[in-house]
């Protein structure tokens, strides 16, 4: 899969920009841009750019091809798990909705047309191992998101059972905060909270088993969900990518450490060496950090989905 032109920001005349996130640009698709046989409803064009964020700050340097790799990993998992949970993808090709004069090749592997859904205002996180903010919470309280865990667990230890630990959904530049299930119920209601929790753990277990067959441990992952006008629940945005998940090479896993992962760890490690206040604007990245980060995303795509990047 050759990498096409690097894309830091997408601008598509005629498609109203709905949201520009840390990585994705989301556009409304006017009805007259849709194919005549498109089912009734509203649709979005979601573009995965090559932007990279760290510590909730979007950095000035892109990772070439990152958006394409993220999109392909997401699409792989959306199709792999559609027997478990409906997702936001629809059968409308990207080139059918792009404005005239826009090169379809630039967007073919980094964009998707999706249903327009009402987002559930909570991040849905599944954890199978004790790491990251969960490890910090456990050290301080013996719990994660109000869930009592056994005493004496070590960093990166596999949990007795996967757990659901929701968090707030912060705006770009702000930080998500872990909340307990009761707080989620107060936000979205008991029935929807239970559906999201059950779907999150169901997908996580399936994905963790599949990843293990590829020699990869899925330590934790974050999902976003949305509902349609009839209240049907969908998984949306991205799915089980190296940006939303913590993947560890199984042969490098070591209890009591923070194992290496298929993500932007090289970037975080480099930034920790700088005298930078972790606020915008972010610093530029050396070429070797960019190259090594790109290689990690490419390896994850190859090992999970069998898709090679030239």
UniProtKB/Swiss-Prot annotation:
Class in the EC hierarchy, top level: ligase
GO MF assignments: ATP binding; phosphoribosylaminoimidazolesuccinocarboxamide synthase activity
A single cellular component GO annotation: cytoplasm
Keywords: ATP-binding, Ligase, Nucleotide-binding, Purine biosynthesis
Gene3D superfamilies associated with the record: ATP-grasp fold, B domain (3.30.470.20), Phosphorylase Kinase, domain 1 (3.30.200.20)
Pathway: Purine metabolism; IMP biosynthesis via de novo pathway; 5-amino-1-(5-phospho-D-ribosyl)imidazole-4-carboxamide from 5-amino-1-(5-phospho-D-ribosyl)imidazole-4-carboxylate: step 1/2
Disulfide bonds: none
Highest taxon in the source lineage: Bacteria
One biological process term in Gene Ontology: 'de novo' IMP biosynthetic process
PANTHER family, per database record: PHOSPHORIBOSYLAMINOIMIDAZOLE-SUCCINOCARBOXAMIDE SYNTHASE
NCBIfam families: PRK13961.1, purC
This protein's name: Phosphoribosylaminoimidazole-succinocarboxamide synthase
Gene this chain is encoded by: purC
């Amino acid at each position: 899969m050759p990498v096409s032109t690097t894309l830091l920001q997408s601008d598509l005349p005629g498609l109203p920009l709905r949201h520009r996130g840390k990585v994705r640009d989301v556009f409304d698709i006017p009805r007259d841009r849709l194919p005549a046989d498109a089912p009734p409803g509203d649709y979005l064009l979601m573009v995965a750019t090559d932007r990279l964020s760290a510590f909730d700050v979007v950095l000035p340097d892109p990772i070439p091809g990152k958006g394409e790799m993220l999109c392909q990993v997401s699409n792989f998992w959306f199709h792999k798990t559609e027997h478990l949970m409906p997702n936001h993808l629809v059968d409308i090709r990207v080139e059918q909705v792009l404005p005239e004069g826009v090169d379809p090749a630039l967007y073919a592997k980094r964009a998707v047309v999706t249903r327009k859904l009402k987002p559930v205002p909570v991040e849905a996180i599944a954890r199978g191992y004790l790491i990251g903010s969960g490890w910090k919470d456990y050290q301080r309280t013996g719990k994660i998101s109000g869930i009592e865990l056994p005493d004496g667990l070590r960093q990166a230890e596999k949990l007795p059972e996967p757990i659901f630990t929701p968090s707030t959904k912060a705006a770009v530049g702000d930080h998500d905060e872990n909340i307990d299930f009761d707080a989620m119920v107060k936000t979205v209601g008991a029935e929807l909270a239970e559906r999201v929790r059950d779907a999150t753990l169901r997908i996580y277990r399936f994905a963790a088993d599949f990843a293990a067959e590829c020699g990869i441990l899925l330590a934790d992952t974050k999902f976003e969900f949305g509902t349609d006008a009839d209240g049907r629940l969908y998984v949306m945005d991205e799915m089980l990518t190296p940006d939303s998940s913590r993947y560890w090479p199984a042969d490098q896993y070591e209890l009591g450490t923070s194992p290496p992962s298929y993500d932007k760890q090289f970037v975080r490690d480099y930034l920790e060496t700088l005298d930078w206040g972790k606020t915008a604007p972010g610093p530029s990245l050396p070429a070797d950090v960019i190259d090594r980060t790109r290689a990690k995303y490419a390896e994850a795509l190859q090992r999970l989905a069998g898709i090679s990047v030239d």
